[in-house]
Amino acid sequence: DATAVHVVLRNRLGMPVATGRLLQHAPGEGRIGRMAVERALRSGGWGRQVLRALEDAARARGDQRVLLQAQVQARAFYERAGYHVHGEPWMEAGIPHIAMQRAL
């Protein structure tokens, strides 16, 4: 996608270990998605680094808010980063999801 911002973090061997994407959702509003961290490296700060880089990119282009859709199991991670739930949970592919957002 030509308008997407992709962040990929690599370990010291050059292997990708964490990733995320930022899209323009509406004027002044970004949408973060495709956040993933290698399972064995979770809780090591990789996800927070990806999220911070995506938020910085959103700010740099003038976004005032970012939205995301997360699996319910990741809720606490995003809440620690300042996100709050927006709306009711839903099921997708048998996994409960929630919409979250954060002002920048």
Predicted regions, residues:
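Conserved beta-strand in the GNAT
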Residues: 8, 15-23, 31-36
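Conserved acetyl-CoA-binding loop-helix of GNAT-fold acetyltransferases
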Residues: 37, 43-56
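Conserved GNAT acetyl-CoA-binding A-motif
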Residues: 51, 57-71
